[in-house]
């Protein structure tokens, strides 16, 4: 394949992205879960800082009376939120929304099979959840940075308001907001892969992430911190059933956005020799592995969480994340054992 036939010279970048995925599915479940935990925590740190910065818009001279300056709030939120993904990429951690691109690229280049993708996606998604929950506990009951349980301060009240907005949207809207989000997140990751120096990578990441946050798109992993923080700070005025109402469709949308508009797009550009049949097969393969992942990593936990919520009410506030953390940890080890046995 001649380079002249490849638009924008994307073939070398796609190859690098695909190869970078290899350690992600060859690592042990303990390391994968820990790396996922760190990514969830990094994204949560970005969200925490964004709320602290955004609250400036609630006070004079930026606010008028009791009406806060919403455009300024969104701009400030977007301006500092990127520190989370910058830490994920530069420091090193495993973020599921980014792994949609990495593992899809590895599959397209035949470096990974279905089981490898499923293992990485499940482990990183579960680790992201655990890290996000830990940071939600950190800012409310453990440090009171966002106030007391049921008595949030200005930062906690803002988190509750954000969480309330997130769980109030309809499922189809959440799906499409998820597409837009991970389209931009993975463009940020793609751009950073095309830049060599650290400062350039930071800029390459910052602008797309600023855009997705300020626009108001939905990120499943960020929501794993934002909504549980709202659940705890509001003393269960927001419920786990509402959490899953958001996260399940957003996860689906994130997968479509990251795969179709980034991983698949650049694979298609990188290989002008592809036949229509090969293109269709790659899309079908993605849908198959994603649906399996979505059921096991998102729908089943949703069923568990909703059942506990209906049965226990407020008693499920801390029990749901505990049980789901155990589910993800055990699941990652079981899946890894199966992958290793067939490797």
Predicted regions and their residues:
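Alpha-helical transmembrane segments and their helix-helix packing motifs
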Residues: 2-343
């Amino acid at each position: 394949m001649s380079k002249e036939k490849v638009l924008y010279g994307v073939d070398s970048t796609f190859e690098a992205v695909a190869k970078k995925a290899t350690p992600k599915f060859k690592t042990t479940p303990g390391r994968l879960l820990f790396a996922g935990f760190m990514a969830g925590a990094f994204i949560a740190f970005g969200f925490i800082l964004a709320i602290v910065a955004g609250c400036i818009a609630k006070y004079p001279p930026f606010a008028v009376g009791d009406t806060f300056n919403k455009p300024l709030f969104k701009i400030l939120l977007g301006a500092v939120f990127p520190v989370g993904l910058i830490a994920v990429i530069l420091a090193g951690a495993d973020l599921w929304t980014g792994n949609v691109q990495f593992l899809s690229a590895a599959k397209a280049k035949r470096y990974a099979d279905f089981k490898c993708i499923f293992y990485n996606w499940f482990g990183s998604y579960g680790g992201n959840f655990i890290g996000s929950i830990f940071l939600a506990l950190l800012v409310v009951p453990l440090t009171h940075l966002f106030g007391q349980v049921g008595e949030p301060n200005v930062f906690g009240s803002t988190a509750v308001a954000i969480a309330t907005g997130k769980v109030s949207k309809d499922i189809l809207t959440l799906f499409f907001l998820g597409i837009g989000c991970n389209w931009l997140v993975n463009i940020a990751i793609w751009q950073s892969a095309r830049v060599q120096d650290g400062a350039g990578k930071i800029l390459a990441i910052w602008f797309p992430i600023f855009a997705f946050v300020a626009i108001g798109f939905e990120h499943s992993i960020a929501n794993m911190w934002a909504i549980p923080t709202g659940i705890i700070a509001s003393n269960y005025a927001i419920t786990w059933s509402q959490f899953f109402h958001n996260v399940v469709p957003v996860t689906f949308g994130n997968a479509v956005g990251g795969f179709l508009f980034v991983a698949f797009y650049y694979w298609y550009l990188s290989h002008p020799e592809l036949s229509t049949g090969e293109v269709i097969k790659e899309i079908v393969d993605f849908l198959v592995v994603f649906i399996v992942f979505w059921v096991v990593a998102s729908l089943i936990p949703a069923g568990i969480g909703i059942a506990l919520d209906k049965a226990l009410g407020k008693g499920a506030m801390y029990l749901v994340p505990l049980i789901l953390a155990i589910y993800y940890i055990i699941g990652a080890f079981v899946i890894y054992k199966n992958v290793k046995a067939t490797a």
